[in-house]
Curated annotation (Swiss-Prot):
Domain of life: Bacteria
Family the entry assigns: Belongs to the UPF0194 family.
Keyword flag Signal: yes
GO cellular component, one term: periplasmic space
Coiled-coil annotated spans: 108-209
Annotated keywords: Coiled coil, Periplasm, Signal
Protein's name in the database: UPF0194 membrane protein YbhG
Length: 332
């Protein structure tokens, strides 16, 4: 009977030991934190003019710091200014034609067309009567067959002129056809699109910095004739500053987006930077050879992007960084 309390006591002791051990493991995991190794991400961009032309001027040189919106260089604007003037003239012509189509014909134009019909009708009547007389003369052998044919030809020509005048008067009275108006509108829209393209081309003959950065290389000099898209500068982007690191699957649960971390560099080991995980790769990959821990290079890991929230100029691209997880880093 004494064995039962002993067994229960031992079970309680074992359970307490398991709970205490688990709590100690959890605390040690939280207190000691996870340490990863990475590098400040290298981000560069090749800058180029979207249009081609002769380089007129370049405002920066290698090593210069640039700001977003800063003018970096310009092409010769003259060809694009001329093209813009031509496009504006094209819009004016197309607009005038479209307005005429919408307005239709004036009363004066209709009256002139009606007068032309009367004149053509009189000419036709005369030609028809003359032809009739010539037929009688030909039957009596007074004129030749050639004279009769000339009279017929004059009659037919007068008839065609009359029909053309009648068609024109009919068109003037009924106004322009919907198809003609639609065609004039399409021509106007095409001219407006060409104008917009000309304005964009002139704008793109000036090279503007897309973001803050440092100029790494200058590939051309003033006077160079470039094709569209030809590289002019290579720029290292300085903001925002990202750290690239890798975590294995066993510790993936600690590296969640929004998690805050501390970032240490060799130059300031006692004054860490602060960062926040912004991205965790959804797919595993083999650790790159650049990782400082050789024993992890053959493991499958997940790439992290850590945004440095208090970066300064001392944090250079490619610099090795130690990433420290822990309670002092905190959570979002």
């Amino acid at each position: 009977m004494m064995k039962k309390p002993v067994v229960i006591g031992l079970a309680v002791v074992v359970l307490a030991a398991v709970v205490a051990g688990g709590y100690w493991w959890y605390q040690s995991r939280q207190d000691n934190g996870l340490t990863l190794y990475g590098n400040v991400d290298i981000r560069t961009v090749n800058l180029s003019f979207r249009v081609g032309g002769r380089v007129e001027s370049l405002a920066v040189d290698e090593g210069d710091a640039i700001k977003a919106g800063q003018v970096l260089g310009e092409l010769d604007h003259k060809p694009y200014e001329i093209a813009l003037m031509q496009a504006k003239a094209g819009v004016s012509v197309a607009q005038a034609q479209y307005d005429l189509m919408l307005a239709g014909y004036r009363d004066e134009e209709i009256a002139q067309a009606a007068a032309a019909v009367k004149q053509a009708q009189a000419a036709y009547d005369y030609a028809q009567n003359f032809y009739n007389r010539q037929q009688g003369l030909w039957k009596s052998r007074t004129i030749s067959a050639n004279d009769l044919e000339n009279a017929r030809s004059s009659r037919d020509q007068a008839q065609a002129t009359l029909k053309s005048a009648q068609d024109k008067l009919r068109q003037y009275r009924s106004g322009n056809r919907e198809q003609d108006i639609a065609q004039a509108k399409a021509s106007l829209e095409q001219a407006q699109a060409q104008l917009a393209q000309a304005e964009l081309n002139l704008q793109d003959s000036t090279l503007i910095a897309p973001s803050d950065g440092t100029l790494l290389t200058r590939a051309v000099e003033p006077g160079t004739v470039l094709n569209e898209g030809g590289t002019v500068f290579t720029v290292s982007l300085t903001r925002p500053v990202w750290v690239r690191a890798y975590v294995d699957e066993r510790n993936l649960d600690q590296a969640q987006p929004g998690r805050k971390v501390l970032l240490y560099t060799d130059g300031r080991p006692d004054k860490p930077y602060h960062g926040q995980i912004g991205f965790v790769s959804p797919t595993a990959e083999f650790t790159p050879k650049t990782v400082e821990t050789p024993d992890l290079r053959t493991d499958l890991v997940y790439r992290l992007r850590i945004v440095v929230t208090d970066a300064d100029d001392a944090l250079r691209q490619g610099m090795p960084v130690t990433v420290q997880f822990g309670n002092e880093a905190g959570h979002e």
